[in-house]
Amino acid sequence: PDPLAEKYSSMSPYMYCGGNPINAIDVDGRSTWVVRAGKGKYEVVGGNLYDNDRNIYVGTLDKKNNKFTREYSIGITTSITSFYYCDAKEGPKWSEESIIDVNDRSGYEFLKKIMSQIPPMIDDYMLNARTGHRYDFKVTNGTDHEIEGIDIYRGMPVGVTDKGQVIFSSARDIGNITAGFIAGVNGMPWIPSRLAFDFYQGGIEGISTRNAEFYGWQLGYYNTSATQKRDNLMNSLGSAVMSLFKSFKNKKK
């Protein structure tokens, strides 16, 4: 049995939007288009922002006429913008040429570890979620160092729905899902969490980031009892105080 599927049975990457995508995710939906790249890999070639569909479709692309012919779906995405780069410098665009690897379990293992261990929010998660640090999954892939040249929009499976559909996410989304989850599991309401994320980043975050953070926040907030959220927050505060005390003692030596 899958421990995450059991722990977060009502809403998790294993039950897309808790079985109610209209309430949890934008009603318009989004589909992502990919072509075969061999050995369980698929290359992102575009998508449709207005087709009321969140599937990842495999098909063929007529580059001359820029026409995509759909064949079948390999699953769905965690967020409406998982493979859509809303805040690219040259303007919003699909993460074309990014690879979705159905055999890559790194994102699944990363989320599984976070959700089972729940690191203290302040002196552990916030300290190590900065760019290039171990919780910055998009560039570290779950390691303790930044991996040079790694694609932040590489895709991978993170679970299945209650109907058996595979759920995929991008590496960038996985890191932001984690941020939202940590806030939610510590009992932080969404609006204060949203403001805290913007403050932490030094400005208003893009919609791609916000969508993933909200998805993660729902996982943590709605699947954790009030008592457990209080305990998680107290543990986070206690850990931060202890870290501060140790730092003060070391400076005095």
Describe these PLM feature segments.
Residues G29, A183, G187-M188, M242-K249:
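Sec-exported extracytoplasmic/periplasmic mature domains
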Residues G91, V102, S193-K253:
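Active-site or metal-binding loop neighborhoods of secreted/extracellular toxin and effector enzymes
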